[in-house]
Amino acid sequence: MGPGGWRKPPLAGRNPLPTADVVIEVGDRVVLVRRKYPPPGWAIPGGFVEVGETVETAAVREALEETGLRVTLTALLGVYSDPARDPRHYTISTVYVGRASGAPLGGDDAAEARLFGEDDLPSPLAFDHAKIMSDYFRYKRTGKRPL
């Protein structure tokens, strides 16, 4: 029991960590980064939200750090919260769509950054990013965002 009879929740100290990702459109292709650190694979640029930072600011910052691209956010794609989506931590990710121009360059914790189309996505995609990319391409075709 805490002060005043307050009961500490069983998962206190293990709350979800907020992350922000952005599907970066460059023309008719999207930017993915090859992760430098485990878990391996290709991923949507993104990362953890820092203290005092908005989720939108984190998405733009992470995109710049990992790809060298200055991104303008254009849409909210969705929020992804499956507790098993990241093997390292329980994360809740807010995923945006954004636009940029130029050639991506891997930086920070991205070993490489490249442009891909729907028919030539690399494998494996890390985390739940295959689902997110599927949701993104469906959104582009239909205008419907995932729930």
Where are these regions (language model features)?
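Acidic, metal-coordinating catalytic segment for phosphate/diphosphate chemistry
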Residues: 1-21
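Residue-level preference for beta-strand/loop junctions
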Residues: 16, 40, 88-92
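Conserved Nudix-box catalytic region and its N-terminal flanking loop in Nudix hydrolases
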Residues: 26-65
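A short coil-to-beta-strand element that immediately follows conserved catalytic motifs
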Residues: 69-78
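Active-site-adjacent beta-strand/loop module that shapes the phosphate/pyrophosphate-binding cleft
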Residues: 80-104, 135-136, 140
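NUDIX/MutT-family hydrolases
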Residues: 97, 105-138
